[in-house]
Amino acid sequence: MRLFILILSAILLLFQYDLWFGKNGYLDYKETAEEIAMHKAENTKLSQRNQVVAAEIRDLKDGVEAIQERARLQYELVKPNETFYRIAKENKDNR
């Protein structure tokens, strides 16, 4: 009877080891859950960035104002009969 209890205890310990430390065990589960959470956060951030880019594309396709604004800011273009003024901030060191 004592031998039977020892064998059952050994089998139980073997199963417990496999449950906690084996392939697809608890530690693998926790690691995978952390990776999933990290990927979900990254996907959320990328989804927000995609929405911003999609809105900008839609605005560039549909709106003339966005194209004019981009041309003015990036290339300093002006309309005919329009005067361009650049206001430079004065450095405190030059006083």
Curated annotation (Swiss-Prot):
Keyword annotations: Cell cycle, Cell division, Cell inner membrane, Cell membrane, Coiled coil, Membrane, Transmembrane, Transmembrane helix
Entry's Gene Ontology BP terms: FtsZ-dependent cytokinesis
Main subcellular location: membrane
Pfam families: DivIC
Membrane topology recorded in Swiss-Prot or TrEMBL: Single-pass type II membrane protein
Subcellular localization: Cell inner membrane
Ranges facing Cytoplasmic side: 1-3
Coiled-coil spans in chain: 28-62
Cellular component aspect of the GO annotation: cell division site; cell septum; plasma membrane
The keyword Cell division is annotated on this UniProt entry: yes
PANTHER family: CELL DIVISION PROTEIN FTSB (PTHR37485:SF1)
The protein's role, per its UniProt record: Essential cell division protein. May link together the upstream cell division proteins, which are predominantly cytoplasmic, with the downstream cell division proteins, which are predominantly periplasmic.
Family from the record: Belongs to the FtsB family.
Subunit structure: Part of a complex composed of FtsB, FtsL and FtsQ.
Name recorded for this polypeptide: Cell division protein FtsB
Source organism of the structure: Mannheimia succiniciproducens (strain KCTC 0769BP / MBEL55E)
